[in-house]
Amino acid sequence: MKRISLIALVTLMSGCTMLEPIETPEVVNATTVVDAVEGDKSKDESSGIVDTLRGRSDPVAGDPAWAPIHPKQQPEHYAAETGSLFSVNHLSNLYDDSKPRGVGDIITVTLDEKTNASKSANADLSKSNDSSMDPLEVGGQELKIDGKYNFSYNLTNSNNFTGDASAKQSNSISGYITVEVIEVLANGNLVIRGEKWLTLNTGDEYIRLSGTIRPDDISFDNTIASNRVSNARIQYSGTGTQQDMQEPGFLARFFNVSL
């Protein structure tokens, strides 16, 4: 009887392990939250051993976090036939300008960024001590110990330290990029975002820009300078063989960290 019970228990346990896991709707329909300005904050999945050794994941064109915004078409209000040429649905202000004001509007940003930083520090420290004592005399005669050593000393000590450090850094970028308005804030400011990809011989180059602007800073030709963009985040880099050659290899990074 015990043997039959044991066989039944083993069979039941083996059957449970062979059952396939049931995927719940939460797992099947799970999505990641994408920030409108900074991009996808979810952990990037490695595409293979090459990306693992390189220690970085290259951006790709068509990233949903940088996708353009397409505003929904608003339905037109029904208007009765009045026989008049005036239509409320197609009303436009005679004195209105063409500055972007809504989600999906396009604006050109003029990139003109120049930063220069330099720092230097100099230190020169010195210290010296000089102390001496003449031999002691008693009755016009030097006082000596054992007839050989007198009571006198001469001490000299000096310390010198010199340090010099300097650091310089400069960056410059110029060009144009056309972005879109992705959000209109309550105070009227516009949140913009956009990217531009250039495919060259053995790699791609891209420019990404995001930030917040004021409609008053937009010029008459629908452009705005990059130094007028608040919380600006500008990325200019590339992918491909040339970009990989600018970085040290896996072994070089390993020895640099370990040593």
Curated annotation (Swiss-Prot):
Signal sequence coordinates: 1-15
Domain of life: Bacteria
GO biological process: bacterial-type flagellum-dependent cell motility
Molecular function terms, GO-annotated: cytoskeletal motor activity
Gene Ontology cellular-component annotations: bacterial-type flagellum basal body, distal rod, L ring; cell outer membrane
Membrane-topology annotation of the record: Lipid-anchor
Pfam families linked: FlgH (PF02107)
Predominant location: membrane
InterPro entries listed in its UniProt record: Flag_Lring (IPR000527)
Lipid attachment points (S-diacylglycerol cysteine): C16
Subcellular location: Cell outer membrane; Bacterial flagellum basal body
Keywords tagged on the record: Bacterial flagellum, Cell outer membrane, Lipoprotein, Membrane, Palmitate, Signal
Record flagged with keyword rRNA-binding: no
Lipid attachment, kind N-palmitoyl cysteine: C16
Function text: Assembles around the rod to form the L-ring and probably protects the motor/basal body from shearing forces during rotation.
Family: Belongs to the FlgH family.
Subunit field text: The basal body constitutes a major portion of the flagellar organelle and consists of four rings (L,P,S, and M) mounted on a central rod.
The name this protein goes by in its record: Flagellar L-ring protein
Gene: flgH
